[in-house]
Amino acid sequence: AFISPDTTTRSLVILAEGTYKLQKVDVIFPVLHGMNGEDGTVQGLFELSKIPYVGCGVLASAVSMDKVYTKIIVDHIGIDQAKFVHVRESDFEHLEEAMDRVEKEIPYPIFVKPSCAGSSKGVSKAENRKELEAALYEAVKHDRNILCEETIVGREVECAVLGAVSYTHLRAHET
C-alpha cells in the first residue's frame, strides 16, 4: 500500500491480485521513531497528500529532531541548559583545534552526540581527550553535525502528559 498521489482522494492505494483499490484515510496517527519518522519527513508527506495527521507539524518535527538547532533555539530564548559546542564534519580537517574549542568550553566528562540520530545511536561519553576524539569519529558516522555537551549530575524526572477533558494527576517517575 502507498499514499495516493491524487490529493483529492485522501486515500491509500492498496495493491492486491493484480489490481488496486482506494482506502479512504480520515486521519493518520504516526507512531514512528527516528529518521524519517519524527524528523518532519513523513509529516511533510502527509501534508503534501492533504491527509490530516496527529502530532507536530513539519517544522516542529524537523527542529526538535536536530539536537544542535534545538539547543540554539533554547539558548536564544534564555532557558538554562547544559553547555554545548557544535562540531561540524568540516571541522575534522583541523580536529585538534576543534577539540581544543570543546575542551575550552566544556569540562570532562563530555557527552558527544550526532545531532540528528535517533535514540542513542552514536552517543558516547568522553572522560579525556583520547576518548573525545574517538567519540567524535563515532558520532560523525551518524551525522555531519555533532553536539558536544557538558554532563549534568542530578535527578532525571520523566512525566507523561496526556490530553483529556478531565485531568488526573499522575506522579512523576524518577530514573
Q: PLM features: residue spans?
A:
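ATP-binding N-terminal substructure of ATP-dependent carboxylate-amine bond-forming enzymes
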Residues: 1-59, 63-69, 76, 87-100
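Proline-rich intrinsically disordered, low-complexity coils
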Residues: 4-5, 52, 107-109, 169
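Active-site nucleotide/adenylate-binding loops and adjacent lid/helix of ATP-dependent enzymes
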Residues: 18-23, 61-155
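Short acidic-glycine loop/turn motifs at beta-strand connectors
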Residues: 163-166
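Aromatic/hydrophobic pocket-lining residues that form π-stacking "cages" and hydrophobic walls in ligand
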Residues: 42, 135, 168
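Conserved small/polar residues in nucleotide/adenosyl-binding loops
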Residues: 168-175
